[in-house]
């Protein structure tokens, strides 16, 4: 809010891009900007007027706003959101989610609960791979790329180790990568550059001719018919990445984290 107020105070424009910003927060930022712009206008004879721009993939609304018109902002924002919900309701459903039941008992040890939790993640991965894989054009193997999102770094590493060591169904092989913010910066830079290349996928075909050298090597050298590429990540995967996965397993921190990660599936 302070930064937005400062932008208004300097007579600059502000663009807010977010899939999950709550209406109250948006209104608070609008008020901060208007307060800054009001101070800016008090210094100059030529006044700047605030223009409200609301846009999504369906439409763009532009409204001139007077200083102090907070109630008008609320009405315009609500109208835009109602129209957006209406348009989304007409779109085909691209993503469906379900809750994976974790059957650990209260009297189990912490180690047993952790193992049960990780095993539920493994079961969910196999189920999602079965329903959302593609066929490699050259080998005819069933391939899927997915992400497992966990809330913190330590369990992120533990999940990765478990998925690499645990038993999988016959004919299934996995390749696991761990992605979190505690990685050495140089290695993280190279990792993100590679992930951006591999997961920026535009094809919608059920049969894919994979071209990446590393992926190709795994497909050609692995005898199993099902190959699952798994990225185990913390919330760093949710923001600022144009990645496209076939499926996701989410340990959510909030509804917003679910929405953010859903935007990385069938992008």
Could you say what each language-model-derived stretch is?
Residues 20-23, 152-155, 183-185, 237-239, ...:
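Conserved nucleotide-binding/hydrolysis micro-motifs of P-loop NTPases
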Residues 215-221, 231-245, 263:
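SF2 helicase motor core recognition
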Residues 255-267:
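Conserved SF2 helicase motif VI
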């Amino acid at each position: 809010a302070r930064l937005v107020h400062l932008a208004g105070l300097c007579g600059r424009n502000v663009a807010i891009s977010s899939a999950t910003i709550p209406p109250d927060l948006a209104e608070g930022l609008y008020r901060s900007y208007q307060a800054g712009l009001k101070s800016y206008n008090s210094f100059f004879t030529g006044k700047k007027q605030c223009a409200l721009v609301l846009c999504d993939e369906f439409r763009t609304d532009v409204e001139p706003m007077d200083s102090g018109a907070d109630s008008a902002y609320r009405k315009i924002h609500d109208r835009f959101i109602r129209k957006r919900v209406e348009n989304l309701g007409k779109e085909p459903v691209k993503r469906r989610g379900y809750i994976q039941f974790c059957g650990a008992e209260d009297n189990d040890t912490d180690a047993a609960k952790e193992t049960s939790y990780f095993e539920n993640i493994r079961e969910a991965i196999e189920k999602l791979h079965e329903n959302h894989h593609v066929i490699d054009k050259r080998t005819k193997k069933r391939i899927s790329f997915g992400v497992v999102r966990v809330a913190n770094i330590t369990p992120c590493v533990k999940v990765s180790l478990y998925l690499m060591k645990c038993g999988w169904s016959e004919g299934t092989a996995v390749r696991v990568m761990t992605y979190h913010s505690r990685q050495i910066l140089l290695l993280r830079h190279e990792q993100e550059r590679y992930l951006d290349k591999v997961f920026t996928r535009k094809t919608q075909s059920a049969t894919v001719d994979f071209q990446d050298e590393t992926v190709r090597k795994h497909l050609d050298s692995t005898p199993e018919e099902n190959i699952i590429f798994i990225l185990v990540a913390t919330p760093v995967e949710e923001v600022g990445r144009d990645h496209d996965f076939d499926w996701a397993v989410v340990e959510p921190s909030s509804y917003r984290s679910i929405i953010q990660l859903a935007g990385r599936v069938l992008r």
